């Protein structure tokens, strides 16, 4: 066990991954310190976290929110320095004092600080899949060039990481890997009549059967866009060609993913659906620590079911495979369109089935370019968001 206290910057501290990360830190105060806590706009929740964990820094979206938090911290004698904006996120992901960064900001907003952490050679615990979806080539190049340690936190990719040999970077085929089996619950609508999907409400879409998640990722799970993004993420994390990544619908969410080998073996990681398990694994790797998760009781499982995904029902999953094969900025365009589509659905401005239709319309209208630089990626992201917003305002899919 390492005797050095690890300073951790938590990007997305008030979200579900951030809260679970802080729970693991709470259980191991002799190993980890919450050095910087970064959130979007939840002042009350971030203040409570600052009181408990006493970070050196806290970050919020804008100056007004930061001023409110700063005043509240001073009123209780906290010396936490409160900052705001993207530049603060970038700085607190790359300071020399920082040992590890939990990258858990949802969506494209997490790209720049997570890339900064990689370029600073940090241990990057990656929960933000959009970083690899938008800029996989740039990000993986930074990880290699600057000697960062990259550990996946998504339960599926963490399971794959655990099921691969330690030297998988020399090439999956060289390691005897035939397939990466990426499991998916199928979301709340996997068995719903197709006619019923036209009337799905945000509340129904956010009611995931197995996992406790934020609203955006819950909707992505319901459309299986989440799994599509994870296919792209797996491609970059493990240098796996698209045809090597097979999505398997597994409603119980007990097998978190698996790897099929040339000798007929299939190695899988099993566990109760609790994000503290992959978080604790990433934090302590290559060691293992208690995560507060109830052990899996094999006698209570009773059965495990598996099926192939329905690409007609889950059009977003097919779109993800399509943009992965196309390459360049196509994945960034899909991600941007989807973020706008999901936000519109949650706000009542787009029907559930309109999410996939809008994503496809943006991809058809906007040609992909090369992923040459961060500026290219951000420009494609901005253009796709603008186009998606226009289509929604025109009520093309109402």
UniProtKB/Swiss-Prot annotation:
E.C. designation(s): 1.1.1.267
Binding site for NADPH: 14-17, 42, 128, 130, 214
GO biological process, one term: isopentenyl diphosphate biosynthetic process, methylerythritol 4-phosphate pathway involved in terpenoid biosynthetic process
Enzyme class: oxidoreductase
Entry keywords, A to Z: Isoprene biosynthesis, Manganese, Metal-binding, NADP, Oxidoreductase
InterPro entries from the UniProt entry: DXP_reductoisomerase (IPR003821), DXP_reductoisomerase_C (IPR013644), DXP_reductoisomerase_N (IPR013512), DXPR_C (IPR026877), DXPR_C_sf (IPR036169), NAD(P)-bd_dom_sf (IPR036291)
Essential cofactor(s): Mg(2+); Mn(2+)
UniProt-recorded Gene Ontology molecular function terms: 1-deoxy-D-xylulose-5-phosphate reductoisomerase activity; manganese ion binding; NADPH binding
Binding residues annotated for Mn(2+), in chain numbering: 154, 156, 230
Gene3D superfamilies on file: 1.10.1740.10, NAD(P)-binding Rossmann-like Domain
Name under which the protein is recorded: 1-deoxy-D-xylulose 5-phosphate reductoisomerase
Organism this protein belongs to: Dechloromonas aromatica (strain RCB)
Source lineage: Bacteria, Pseudomonadati, Pseudomonadota, Betaproteobacteria, Rhodocyclales
Gene of this entry: dxr
